Amino acid sequence: MMSHPCVSLLGVPVLNPALVPHLAQGQVLLVSDPSPNTDPAKYSESTSATRHQMKGEDAQPQEMASTSFPRASGPSPEFRQHGDSDGKRGSPQNLPIEHHFACKECGDTFRLKVLLVQHQRVHSEEKGWECGDCGKVFRGVAEFNEHRKSHVAAEPQPGPSRALENAAEKREQMEREAKPFECEECGKRFKKNAGLSQHLRVHSREKPFDCEECGRSFKVNTHLFRHQKLHTSEKPFACKACSRDFLDRQELLKHQRMHTGHLPFDCDDCGKSFRGVNGLAEHQRIHSGAKPYGCPHCGKLFRRSSELTKHRRIHTGEKPYACGQCGKAFRQSSSLLEHARIHSGERPYACGECGKAFRGPSDLIKHRRIHSGLKPYECDKCGKAFRRSSGLSRHRRIHSGARRCECSQCGRVFKRRSALQKHQPTHHE
C-alpha cells in the first residue's frame, strides 16, 4: 500500500496551513499499489478514475489523526466540489457522503476531525498566536509568521554614526578600566595612585626635590637625578648610530627611533605619529586646547611643562647652561648646544635646495622660507607678512611708535638694536 503524501502529515502536532485546502478536497484515502498481475495500461486508467472519485468519499475516522491542531478558520467554500449548487459535498457521481464529525454548536459536519476542531474556534473565540510586539492575534501560524516579518523589517538598524559612538564609548570604558585614577583638575588618568600623586604637583606647583648644587627644585626625584648629571657631565647612555650621549635609557630609546623611523604612538584625531607617549600627550592638547601649565608671575599658560620652565627663567633671570669655552650662559640647553657649534665650527643642518648649512634646526627652518616664500607672521594692523617673528616685532613698533633702544651716552633712541649698535661707535671717535 502507498499512502498519499498529505496523510502522513496528519500524525505530526502542527498542521501546515498550506495543506488545509488540499485536505478539504478529500484526498486523504489510501491508494493501492498496482499488483504484479495488473496490466499497467488498465491500472493507469482505473487509477485515474479512482482518484477522481476519492474527492467525494469520506475517510474512515480510524485512519485520521485525532490530534488537535493549533489554528484554523471557518468552513471554506472550497469544500464544495465540482460546482455543487446545493452546497452538498460529493463526487461527480453523487456518491453518498457520511459526515462523521459534527459541530454541536451549529450542526455543520466535516469529513476530518481536524477541520471540526479548527471550525469550533469560531464559536469559542479561542485565541491563537499573539504578537509580542503589537498584541495582534492570529489563528493560523502562517499568518502569524508573515506578520512577524513586518516587525523585523521595521526595526531600526544601527547606522555608521551610532557604531562610531559605540566604539568611542568602548575605548573610554577600556581606558577607565586600565587607568582608574583620574585627576579632578584636568581629567588625565593614571594606572597607579602614585602617578596621580606625582601629576597633582603640576597643578599645585609643589617641587619637593631640591638640587644641592644649584638649588633648582623638581616635582619628581627622577627628574632631580637626571638634572644632577648635568653638573657631573655624566651621560652614560650612548647611541651606537651617532655616538650621541644621553642622561638616561628612556632618552636614548626615544632618540634611537629617529634612526629607525619607528613611531609607535598615533594620534586618534589626525593620525600623526610620535616616538614617545609624552610627545603624543603634548600633541593631543593641540586638539583639546588644554594648557594646564600656568606661569605664577604673569599668568601665561602653556601646553607643556618644559615651555613653562623655560618661560619662568625670563622672570627669574636664571641661565643654568654655561659654555665651557667662553663662559656665556643660556636659559635653554638647546641654545647652549647651538652656541658650542660656534667654537667647533659644526653645521650639521644643511638646506636641500642650496646646500647652505646651519648650526641649529630653527635657523634651517627660517632659511627654507626663502625658497618656499612662506611668511607665516602677519601684522594685524596692515597685513604685512614676515618670515620671522622678530621681523614682525620690529615692524609693530612702527604702528605703536615705541623706541626701546636708547643710547646710554646721549639718550638717543632707535627703533632697532642694529641701528643703536651702528650709532654707539660715534661716541668713541
Curated annotation (Swiss-Prot):
SMART domains: ZnF_C2H2
Keywords: DNA-binding, Metal-binding, Nucleus, Phosphoprotein, Repeat, Repressor, Transcription, Transcription regulation, Zinc, Zinc-finger
Major site of localization recorded for this protein: nucleus
Family annotation (InterPro entries): Znf_C2H2-type, Znf_C2H2_sf, Znf_C2H2_type
Gene Ontology MF annotations: DNA-binding transcription factor activity, RNA polymerase II-specific; RNA polymerase II cis-regulatory region sequence-specific DNA binding; zinc ion binding
GO biological process: regulation of transcription by RNA polymerase II
Comp. bias intervals (Polar residues): 34-51
Alphabetized Gene3D superfamilies for the sequence: Classic Zinc Finger
GO cellular component, one term: nucleus
Pfam families: zf-C2H2
Keyword Protease: no
Record PTM Phosphoserine, positions in chain: S76
Biased composition (Basic and acidic residues): 79-89, 167-176
Region (Disordered): 31-95, 149-176
Compartments where located: Nucleus
Zinc finger C2H2-type: from-to: 101-123, 129-151, 181-203, 209-231, 237-259, 265-287, 293-315, 321-343, 349-371, 377-399, 405-427
Chain's role: May be involved in transcriptional regulation.
Protein family (similarity comment): Belongs to the krueppel C2H2-type zinc-finger protein family.
Protein name, per record: Zinc finger protein 275
Organism, scientific name: Homo sapiens
